[in-house]
């Protein structure tokens, strides 16, 4: 157990018997009342956001974590098979842990996996931006290129994103894995 004053953004704590990551932590002392910490947390099992007010002298259970880099190999039913880049050991990571960004994973991508002190997987962090090839999209007509609209495109991983009209099949684009949005065209 450690004091809430020793916790910072990004720390992982056990709150109500489940792992939560601290996304924001603000110390407040309102008028003549006692000081407290307002914490914005994300439950790592359910993905729900939680707001909680800790008293200034309250203690929390800090989870000791270990971060390792793994390489994505393939998908096996509901799990993603990853390989440790240093020991070549393979593990299965549940699709719920990776979440929506999993649709942008392609073989060979590197993923940071965070383990709890008991060996369980807390979260998997994909690169913020990935470069993927557009495999299918409607061809743009001359009139379409003059407007600033967008059109759907299917990427090499099967994910669908909206892209500008000038993007064509076989173009390489950069996608933000957090939002699933097109960022820019990559010139190679």
Swiss-Prot record:
GO terms for cellular component: cytoplasm. Its main location: cytoplasm. It comes from the Bacteria. Keywords: Cytoplasm, Elongation factor, Protein biosynthesis. One of its GO terms (biological process) is peptide biosynthetic process. The keyword Protein biosynthesis applies. The keyword Cell cycle does not apply. GO terms for molecular function: translation elongation factor activity. SMART domains: EFP, Elong-fact-P_C. It is found in: Cytoplasm. Transmembrane segments: none annotated. InterPro entries: Elong-fact-P_C (IPR015365), NA-bd_OB-fold (IPR012340), Rib_uL2_dom2 (IPR014722), Transl_elong_fac_P/YeiP (IPR020599), Transl_elong_KOW-like (IPR013185), Transl_elong_P/YeiP_cen (IPR001059), Transl_elongation_fac_P (IPR011768), Translation_prot_SH3-like_sf (IPR008991). Pathway: Protein biosynthesis; polypeptide chain elongation. PANTHER family: ELONGATION FACTOR P (PTHR30053), ELONGATION FACTOR P (EF-P) FAMILY PROTEIN (PTHR30053:SF12). Belongs to the elongation factor P family. Involved in peptide bond synthesis. Stimulates efficient translation and peptide-bond synthesis on native or reconstituted 70S ribosomes in vitro. Probably functions indirectly by altering the affinity of the ribosome for aminoacyl-tRNA, thus increasing their reactivity as acceptors for peptidyl transferase. HAMAP family: EF_P. This is Elongation factor P. It comes from Prosthecochloris aestuarii (strain DSM 271 / SK 413).
